[in-house]
Amino acid sequence: MNISKAEQRVLHVLAKGGYIAFTRDDAGRVTHVQCLTREGLGLADCSLAVFTKLKTKRLILSRQGRPYRVTIDGLKAVRAQLDNR
């Protein structure tokens, strides 16, 4: 599966325990997204376009109105990255 660099960065953060917080408008459409790490720091690469691509590919999922998290398919699709902690 072809995944862009921005999508890889977002999936990597989600795979490590992060989540995507979102806001909806009156019609129920997602209007704003923010990717947060498990420490609570924001990721600048997470845009509405990246969010839509990940959701269309079913790599992220929201259950019962909670923030979006990575799916099993998303974990399989993410490539390993070096963590400079």
Curated annotation (Swiss-Prot):
* Highest taxon of the lineage: Bacteria
- Quote any Pfam family the record assigns: YjhX_toxin
The record's annotation in NCBIfam families points to: PRK13687.1 (NF010240)
- What family is reported? Belongs to the UPF0386 family.
Q: What's this protein's name?
A: UPF0386 protein Spro_1532
Species per Swiss-Prot/TrEMBL record: Serratia proteamaculans (strain 568)
